[in-house]
Amino acid sequence: MPSNVLFRIYRWKYFWLCLIVIITLAMHLSIITNPSELILDEQHYVKDARYILENEQTQRPEHPPLAKLFIVSGITAFGDNPWGWRIPSILMGTIEIALFYFICRRLNMSNRAANIATFLFGFENFNFLLASVAMLDVFFVTLMLAFFLLYLSREYVLSGIFIGLAALAKLYAALGTPPLLIHWVFSRTRPSRWFILTVILAPVSFIVLMPLFDFAITHEFQNPIMRIKEMLTLSSSLTFDNTTHPAISRPWEWILNYIPMAFWYTPHYTGAISPSVWGFIIPVVLYMIYKAVKGNDAGLFGFAWFFGTFLLWIPISIATDRVSFVFYFYPTIGALCIGLGLGLNQAMEWASSQTRKAKIPVMAGIVVFFLFHIASFIVLTPVFIRS
């Protein structure tokens, strides 16, 4: 009887998703207090959360309010300590993995392909790192993924609200809208024209909800148009011309050169794309274009996602000269994991129909890739190497 129960659990379609979520959550919690000091931009956002709690004002007006409120809520619930600073990010990062899996399934990827993509996503270094620290990025990326999933589920009202919420966590989330416009235009199974509700509600929800979230911080209502102007002015003030930070880099450098960025040294929090993902960026993007041309919805969506959250950064960087860092690539990781999941699953399907002589080298190569991905994770994250 117990063996039958275990077999049914193993055969459950959400088994691998749950296992990935449980393992990554456990790893997050195992390092939540290490270090006990503020990591990188936690210096800005945790200190700002303290200032909000003490003074009902923000020291970081260049950013919208929602992600700040998540960090404030963590400190309020768990205290001004590493648990309070980082638990909201960890919980959002855990939700993010589940959302990603269901996005894959909504794109008609097989359960195996979705599991492969989710495995790569869950154990990708940047994805894990930015869910481990009290920075703004994991909040807007998770809300952006909710936006993607709601759009794919044809929940157009909610999708419009959620991209507004994502932008209220960090303005960069606005780059999540072009992928859906591209997908809507080019998809062979074009979604309903009610998608216009998403387009309308995205800016409306941003403008309407921002004064409410700002009020939660300052207890005063502020003009949302003036706040938008303030955020755009302040966020564009740091340029490559007037900034000397050693880690700044242009978007095209992120894929042409391997650029690790130290978040913390002991234990080492290394800001870098997992080599197992970085090394395949260009082939995977070309593969997704090929799949999109062949009518594959996941290939189209994956490329559109890559275009919106990364390729658009290149003209933006040239036009504005605004400083950027390699961790700005983080919102694009999911697109590449979709492409890798599609490709690896297709290779496995092809190998299964071949002779043993042809099958063995293909399957061996896939196993080596998975081991390389895990090895990259072990080397880059502070979970296993803490000295």
Where are these regions (language model features)?
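Transmembrane signal-anchor helices characteristic of membrane glycosylation enzymes that use polyprenol
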Residues: 12-39, 201-221, 370-380
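Specific aromatic-rich, kink-prone transmembrane helix
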Residues: 99, 120, 139-158, 162, ...
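Membrane-lumen/periplasm interface segments of specific transmembrane helices
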Residues: 193-258, 263-264
